[in-house]
Amino acid sequence: EFDLLVVGNGHHWDARYPDFPGEFTGESLHSHHYIDPQSPLNLSGKRILVVGIGNSAADITVELSSKALQNSVTLSTRSSAWIVPKYIAGRPLDSIARTSPYIPLSWQRKALQLMAPALGIDPQLYGLPAPNHKLLEAHPTQSVELPLRLGSGDVTPKPNVTRLDGETVYFEDGTSGVFDVI
């Protein structure tokens, strides 16, 4: 039992929506309001577009692409992100970085950048666009399962959205898709 609860969610307190040209006539839901595949919307048997590749987007994409939900899930990203595991050899990733205080951070970043393809953290390996930044110059996305879902075809990768037209969404690569929910 506690006398007080403090929620320290920092800059993530305010839901931000991208401003795409056109109008989407399907359902829209921000991750800020997402609870699970049944609440606040029934997200089963749907054509779903997840926009963004932060940690919340990755977690929601993985959950909604479960075969049991029978969804078609597409992930669209504007700037992309490096996808790193939450754990390496049973240890949290950030604790491994702290074990190398004598190696300059710039050297650590360069070594990781060179090893990115071998480590499987380069999003281009899974059909996503190249990040617009070097590894660790911006917050990476932490997910073990997202690369598996992208690699298996359970999630379809797409570049940024260019415009909306009813239930049709157009992407930078010239393709389009019809979606029930964004």
What is each PLM-predicted segment?
Residues 89-93:
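Short secondary-structure boundary/capping segments
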Residues 1-55, 59-81, 86-87, 101-182:
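Flavin (primarily FAD) cofactor-binding/catalytic cores of flavoenzymes
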Residues 97-98:
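Basic, ligand-binding patches in group-transfer machinery
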